[in-house]
């Protein structure tokens, strides 16, 4: 996933990068279904909820806030979600 907010070019760009892939999970080892995103005791449980979906959501919300508030950027802000970190198959070009 890629999105870019353009700045005026007076500063270098910044990349907000996260990975979207997850490691395999054995449902027998989980107290909730690993793909459920279940909320238990005020915490979201599920594959990727900590590594790295949370960071991706924070980055997306940052990008949206910058856009909605019409912040005048000195450099581009690039939002990048990759899909090869867990597999160590670094072929996404990032």
PLM region spans:
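Acidic/His- and Gly-rich active-site-bordering loop/insert found
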Residues: 1-47, 66-73
């Amino acid at each position: 996933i890629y999105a870019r907010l353009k700045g005026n070019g007076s500063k270098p760009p910044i990349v907000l990068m996260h990975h979207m892939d997850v490691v395999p999970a054995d449902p027998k080892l989980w107290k909730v279904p690993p793909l459920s995103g279940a909320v238990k005791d005020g915490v979201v449980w599920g594959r990727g909820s900590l590594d790295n979906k949370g960071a991706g959501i924070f980055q997306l919300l940052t990008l949206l806030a910058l856009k909605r508030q019409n912040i005048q950027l000195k450099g581009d802000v690039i939002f990048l979600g990759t899909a090869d970190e867990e597999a160590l198959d670094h072929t996404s070009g990032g």
